[in-house]
């Protein structure tokens, strides 16, 4: 309880945050770095107001959209689109495991604000947008070995 109180998260925000960490991470070890990226963004909201998590958008298309028969209301899209919405989405996008909850409260101390993942689930972290663009090219090169043109999200 003390760690949650010290985090600045409400219980609901912690559940939402941990669900994103769960979906974005390829392994338990990566959860702590992924958590760090999102903590860094939330802590520097003037420069990085949006989490920009692909998994929140994937949640819309994979789980919400089928119920709306290709006609998702804009308010629903806006509630989960972390490329267009500041801060956390309105709700959790998955059931987080204990490791994701722990990583959400105890992120690694990193300078990173960006990450991208290739099809092999290797994470590439960057401090700047320029580093992120270079990492995207690295991920695309790995993906191309598997016949994938571009990035795979979520």
Regions found by a protein language model. Name each.
Residues 1-154:
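Bacterial extracytoplasmic/cell-wall-associated proteins, especially those involved in peptidoglycan
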């Amino acid at each position: 309880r003390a760690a949650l109180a010290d985090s600045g998260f409400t219980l609901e925000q912690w559940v939402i945050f941990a669900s994103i960490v769960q979906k974005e991470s390829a392994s338990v070890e990566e959860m702590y770095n992924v958590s760090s990226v999102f903590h860094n963004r939330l802590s520097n909201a003037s420069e990085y107001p949006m989490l920009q998590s692909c998994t929140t958008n994937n949640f819309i298309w994979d789980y919400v959209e089928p119920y709306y028969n290709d006609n998702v209301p804009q308010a629903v899209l806006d509630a989960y689109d972390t490329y267009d919405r500041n801060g956390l989405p309105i709700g959790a996008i998955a059931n987080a495991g204990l490791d994701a909850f722990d990583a959400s409260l105890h992120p690694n101390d990193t300078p990173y604000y960006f990450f991208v993942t290739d099809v092999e689930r290797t994470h590439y972290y960057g401090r700047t947008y320029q580093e992120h663009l270079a990492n995207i090219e690295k991920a695309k090169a790995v993906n191309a070995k598997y016949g994938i043109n571009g990035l795979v999200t979520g």
